[in-house]
């Protein structure tokens, strides 16, 4: 009965679509940006490389409440830095309710999730790129390969296991996005930031529908497993550390 109700409830499908949007946007952007940053800072000397790693990793180790406080101020309709900057540039003439407008709220959540998710992948990619066989890179350079060719033919296959790990972890974290929504929007406005995880929480601990929430949890676990298997099948190249 719970599963029958679940798959006929529009609110669940809205939460599922929001969750899939977060995953589809966050996973490739976090992976690509992390690899790009790691590629840029890996050739640096130890001091600047360590500095940049710390800078990008800082949001990942900062408490969620502290992160939310900072971003809530930045998104504030009247005193926030985003509206101030856009007004100063003449892009807008009226304040935007970033977290109170269904058109923008989900993108604000994705942006915050992105900034808190890139730290660990950057550190992992720096380590992976540092382990790439230098003799292969030097041989490619001697043969006249461009930096782009060297990256795609040598470095990219070498960091594929790290990319697989980053993609799976980012997928799981995106599906489990909850604290940001709980503290920033509570699923609103108009369920525009409702996710499957938050939908599960609401039904379990607000409406006390434990059986229904359990059904939501089972469906969420199956979806995460399917995404993880798909990523493993498409990205696993047999390369080992």
Spans of model-derived segments:
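A structural signal for multi-pass alpha-helical bundles of membrane permease subunits
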Residues: 1-241
